[in-house]
Amino acid sequence: MGRMRWFVSVVIVVAAVVSLNAQNPRSSGALTPQIESVLRAIKAADKGLLAVSEEDGRFLRVLVAARHAKSILEIGAASGYSGIWLGLGARESGGRVVAIEYDPQRAREAADNVRKAGVGDVVRVIRGDAFAEIPKLPGTFDLVFLDAWKPDYKKFFDMVFPRLTPGGVFVAHNVVNKKNEMEPFLRTILTHPSLYTTIVSPSGEGMSVSYKTRLPADRAILR
């Protein structure tokens, strides 16, 4: 139970920091005018409402930094809004982000936007089907952010979980406002014996945050 309480406490603190930073533009988490300009432009052009909220973006940044994540995978990059936030966190953690986007136009936009925001050195955008591209990537992942087609969430989790490092974090978007589209996934992460999962909602969309325990499954379930 101690590990679970610690994990939830960390997530709550991260969410609180995000809330304070969003309310205080002079905080240490403030963005440069160039980054703010790029993020505003993405939002203005986001007619399909594919980008995460600013609050969710800030949450991702702090989570990457707090986890000291070195290898970060984003599944569903859209036009690069969340990738920029992940990249800002990766700059602080010394990590690298691989962001995969299926749609060719959005993938081009994402690559251009991360470059304009100044995080192109830590964020690599790949255009293609994530189911085909993920097996090509080497190594393991410290943090995975999933924001793709919701009925595919369970399939993506099954593919990526074996490559999530012990102590790694799996984050999924829209688990509150689109929960009916991903019920098999939600059942899995909430009952998995090797995960500690909590749901947070910096905005109304909601994110699941699942920590892969370092304990064997038969011991982790006793948490």
For every predicted segment, state its role.
Residues G2, W6, L20-F145, K150-V171, ...:
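A short alpha-helical cap/connector motif
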Residues V8-S19:
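Bacterial N-terminal signal peptides
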